[in-house]
Amino acid sequence: MAETEEEETVSEEASGFSDLSDSELLDLEDTQESSASASKPGPSYELPGKDDKLIRSPKWKRRLDVSSPMERFHLKYLYVTDLSTQNWCEQQMVYGKEFSGFLTPEKSAILDTGASIHLARELEVHDLVSIPITSKEDAWAVKFLNILSMIPTLQSEGRIREFPVFAEVEGVLLVGVIDELHYTASGELELTELKTRGNPVLPSDAQKKKDYFQVSLYKYIFDAMVQGKVTAASLIHHTKLDPEKPLGPSVLRHAQQGGYSVKSLGDLIELVFLSLTLSDLPLIDSLKIEYVHQGTATVLGTEMVAFAEKEVRSKVQHYMTYWMGHREPQGVDVEEAWKCRMCNYADICEWKKSGGLISATLEPQVKKAK
């Protein structure tokens, strides 16, 4: 990539938000809010914003009495975008968790625009119904009702959007939202991920690799669901949901209107897993990423992604060792130090201060010398 093109894209990509699925944004914000409320704030940090303006953001005190980041950040599960952000820069992802309330107006506007484009695409497929919820069980019940309503459409080779996926991967529950599923002219089930761009240029190769990993994870989880590899017991264990909790009145009313005879979350979970098992849905055959310019809604290009299961599993295993507390977070190698130029956390980055960029480069040479 030419230097000028890299400069155009680095500002957007180095933020860590350019790969965030707008579908998962609200869920991610909810998780961050619950994490922040349970954390103990320490002294504030001033982070450099655009044009070197200081933006004050709380510095969350790291607790030393917990054994893993999952516990420190009070997380019951991870999002697919958590792992894809690790693929960009793991250290940046960690700072994003620690400074969960830090979002510049520019990035907020980018996310809002992207969400609007996603919403327009979704309304092309189906209407949206607002369902008031009163508990986390209700929130998950709505996800399950969405799955139940989409299964028949997939069985009849229709097109769906915003399909919730979840599976236990390497001992951690991984959750996401598939942007679109449809069948090609040859009858193959294809996943399409919409990526909106603030600049009218395609992303760098490094960004594309992160996007490839993200859609590959979606396929990995979806395939596990339709193959019966995901269990209700695992889901309940990780989310700490109460299967005996009665559904809220609005959720119950919506379920009954859909023809589902359920009273509790457990009834709904049982129905979802039974439907997935008996649906005979195919595995995802192809993966496609569509890049769209936010300002004009122009399609900038599409990328077909080859699914490499062995590589995906290897990356997931490595990333999960951080979440399970088996290693410290890592930053980028020196070859990708350009990512740091517009990173909001560059001035406080422990990876840079500890010489991580250099050591990551020298380590292979040391090994060869032995």
UniProtKB/Swiss-Prot annotation:
Cofactor or coenzyme needed: [4Fe-4S] cluster; Mg(2+)
Region (Disordered): 1-52
Localization of this protein: Nucleus; Cytoplasm, Cytosol
BP terms from Gene Ontology: interstrand cross-link repair
Chief location category: nucleus
Cofactor note: Binds 1 [4Fe-4S] cluster.
Keyword Cell membrane part of the UniProt annotation: no
Residue stretches of biased makeup (Acidic residues): 1-11, 21-32
InterPro entries in UniProt: EXOV, PDDEXK-like_dom_sf
GO cellular component: cytosol; nucleoplasm; nucleus
Enzyme class: hydrolase
Binding sites annotated in the UniProt record for [4Fe-4S] cluster: 89, 340, 343, 349
EC numbers, comma separated: 3.1.-.-
Assigned keywords, A-Z: 4Fe-4S, Cytoplasm, DNA damage, DNA repair, DNA-binding, Exonuclease, Hydrolase, Iron, Iron-sulfur, Magnesium, Metal-binding, Nuclease, Nucleus
GO molecular function: 4 iron, 4 sulfur cluster binding; DNA binding; metal ion binding; single-stranded DNA 5'-3' DNA exonuclease activity
Family: Belongs to the EXO5 family.
Described function: Single-stranded DNA (ssDNA) bidirectional exonuclease involved in DNA repair. Probably involved in DNA repair following ultraviolet (UV) irradiation and interstrand cross-links (ICLs) damage. Has both 5'-3' and 3'-5' exonuclease activities with a strong preference for 5'-ends. Acts as a sliding exonuclease that loads at ssDNA ends and then slides along the ssDNA prior to cutting; however the sliding and the 3'-5' exonuclease activities are abolished upon binding to the replication protein A (RPA) complex that enforces 5'-directionality activity.
Assembly mode: Monomer; monomeric form has weak exonuclease activity. Homodimer; homodimeric form is unsure but has much higher exonuclease activity, suggesting that it could homodimerize upon DNA-binding. Interacts with the replication protein A (RPA) complex.
Protein name, UniProt field: Exonuclease V
